[in-house]
Structures are given as structure tokens and as C-alpha cells.
């Protein structure tokens, strides 16, 4: 991609993903659905724990934020594995997360090939 497109479109959009999902998650709440006087149906919004995030090689920084932002905004921790064709993107995102105040261990970056590292994450 041309550098001007990356600087003027992709990076700002990636940043916006964090703002967007932070705002959306603040609006989420559990809902109750009446069934009858003996039952209660409800939704519960809570973190699921550790999320394995595998992101492709195309527009890697922005696609990584599509996965990382909602994961962290909902209170989960993440293990991010980028394509072996764009590994530095994940490293930089991890550095930026630390600079932004996200505690160490909340966003974890692993490197490797899909057949080994990616496969281990999804099993």
C-alpha cells in the first residue's frame, strides 16, 4: 500500500477501532426477557477470558485492531498471532498497547507460522 494511504487512512481507522469498541461496550448491558412467573431468561455480559486472535497478512495493523479492540474492551486478555508475512505489525501494536497503559500480559504477541503457532492457538 502507498505510504500516504497507510498514514492517512489505515492508521487513523485502526485508532478509531479502539474508540468505537470502547464506546459500544459501555452501552452493552444484560437484558431480562420475561417468559412466565416460574422462569427467567436473561443475557449476561461478561468477559470470556483469554482470546486467541489470528490476523491475516493484508492490511495487518487495521485487521489486528478489528480483533484486539473488542476483545480488550470487553475485559478479555488476548494472544495475537499475525501472519508470518507481517510479524512486525503485531510487535508494534503490543508496544503501543503498553505505551497506552494496557498492563503487561493483557495483550500478548506470539510469532510463528500458521501451521505451528496458529494451530497451537486454536486448539
What are these regions (language model features)?
Residues 2-3, 104:
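Residue-level detector of short coil/turn "hinge" positions at structural boundaries
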Residues 3-28:
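Long amphipathic alpha-helix in the N-terminal Rossmann-like dinucleotide-binding domain
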Residues 17-20, 29-123:
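Rossmann-like NAD(P) dinucleotide-binding subdomain of oxidoreductase/dehydrogenase enzymes
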Amino acid at each position: 500500500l502507498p505510504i500516504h494511504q497507510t498514514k492517512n487512512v489505515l492508521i487513523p481507522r485502526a485508532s478509531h477501532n479502539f474508540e468505537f469498541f470502547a464506546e459500544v461496550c459501555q452501552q452493552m448491558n444484560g437484558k431480562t426477557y420475561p417468559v412466565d412467573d416460574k422462569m427467567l431468561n436473561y443475557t449476561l455480559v461478561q468477559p470470556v477470558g483469554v482470546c486467541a486472535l489470528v490476523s491475516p497478512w493484508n492490511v495487518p495493523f487495521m485487521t489486528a485492531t478489528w480483533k484486539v479492540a473488542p476483545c480488550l474492551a470487553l475485559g478479555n486478555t488476548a494472544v495475537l498471532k499475525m501472519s508470518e508475512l507481517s510479524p512486525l505489525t503485531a510487535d508494534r501494536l503490543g508496544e503501543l498497547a503498553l505505551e497506552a497503559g494496557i498492563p503487561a500480559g493483557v495483550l500478548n504477541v506470539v510469532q510463528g507460522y500458521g501451521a505451528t503457532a496458529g494451530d497451537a492457538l486454536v486448539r
